[in-house]
Amino acid sequence: ASNFELFHEYQKRIVEELLEEYSSKGITLLKDEGENANMYLAINGNKLLYTRWNGDIEVTKKVYYNQYNDAIGTYYCKYHRPKLDYNKFAGEVKAAFKRAFNMYFDMVKRVKEQKIEGKIRELEKDFE
């Protein structure tokens, strides 16, 4: 198998393993159409992780702002290039995912505590 095929195999395994661990905590799998399509792990419609066609995995960063443009919450952003060593690659991704998952709940709590009036905006940050 080419590295490309191997990395897609790794992506599937990592997503399956995370889903097994987190589905009882509200994480769901979303998928685009087609072969080697992007897969997403989401909670309440918020995507925490997605796979890329080239074998990369991204754990996303999202910032929430109140009506005064104060950032009131954020969750972690980590970009993973695939590695031939599955355990190393999976370990990094899972650690980042766990952090994003915990930060998501921390952010939701902070948003509720602030009882912000008006609309809360979300802004997806691009990867540098």
Where are these predicted regions, by residue range?
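Contiguous, amphipathic alpha-helical segments that mediate oligomerization or scaffolding
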Residues: 1-7, 96-111
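Generic detector of well-ordered alpha-helical segments enriched in charged/polar residues
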Residues: 12-19, 98, 102-105, 117, ...
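Intrinsically disordered, low-complexity regulatory segments enriched in Ser/Thr/Pro
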Residues: 36-103
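Short acidic, low-complexity intrinsically disordered linear motifs used
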Residues: 110-128
